[in-house]
């Protein structure tokens, strides 16, 4: 989705989130990287992680999610604030194992920005386990 399309910034951000989830659950690394701006940042507790490039992002996710992770779902997504080039989303995230049992549930703030000609995730602050 480009910045010039008639949809709102919030609609663009929500479309990024949908693409992100499908790419993550499909383990499609290139598609997942396309939903992120790099460098990409994640704050958990007081630890700030940074991925300068896409190369290690998916392998790092698998390490964070654990061996039992099979898929992720957004339980809720609420638009908190939007401008022409930035959207803040509060997301409640569920992670499931191969038996579709809930293995993690946490809140996260996602910042979706329009830069370099595309909408993508720039930063998130998560209440996930470290």
Question: How would you label these PLM feature ranges?
Answer:
Residues 103-130:
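Short beta-strand edge/turn micro-motifs at domain boundaries
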Residues 1-38:
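Short, low-complexity N-terminal intrinsically disordered segments enriched in polar/charged residues
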Residues 74-80, 92-95, 107-113:
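Hydrophobic/aromatic beta-strand elements that line small-molecule binding cavities or substrate pockets
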